[in-house]
């Protein structure tokens, strides 16, 4: 669902509405992912978090529960994540249309 915040009162809703409905941002996963691997040290389970636009709270919540959290950029190769021998792999939520992430989805599979 798209929306608009404006202070203007003099706009034509009939003119703007089709533009709002057609608006579809691209490249948002790569624009929001971390740029390099981040580690939140812990003594519990070792979790790999693939950052597809993750909110900071996701990694923090796992870390707070004792997990070692390795946060990886969205374009990280599967072999690099698996080489760290994680106990589990988590895919974060993120912005945009998943259909745009064909290479990431292929790598995950």
Which residues make up each language-model segment?
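Internal gly/pro-rich beta-alpha loop/helix module
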Residues: 1-37
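Fold-independent oxyanion-binding glycine-rich loops
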Residues: 8-9, 35, 50-53, 74, ...
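Phosphate-binding glycine-rich loops and adjacent basic patches that engage nucleotide phosphates
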Residues: 18-26, 41-43, 66-75
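Glycine-/acidic-rich phosphate or pyrophosphate-binding loops and their flanking alpha/beta elements
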Residues: 24-49, 80-83, 104
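Flexible gly/pro-rich beta->alpha loop and the following alpha-helix that scaffold active-site loops
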Residues: 55-109
């Amino acid at each position: 669902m798209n929306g608009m915040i404006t202070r203007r009162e003099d706009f034509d809703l009939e003119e703007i509405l089709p533009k709002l409905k057609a608006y579809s941002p691209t490249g948002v996963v790569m624009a929001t992912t971390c740029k390099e691997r981040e580690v939140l040290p812990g003594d519990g389970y070792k979790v790999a978090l693939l950052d597809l636009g993750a909110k900071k709270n996701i990694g923090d919540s796992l870390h707070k529960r004792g997990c070692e959290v390795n946060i990886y950029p969205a374009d990280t190769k599967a072999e690099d994540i698996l080489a760290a021998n994680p106990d589990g792999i988590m895919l974060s939520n993120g912005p945009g249309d998943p259909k745009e992430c064909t290479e990431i989805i292929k790598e995950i599979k």
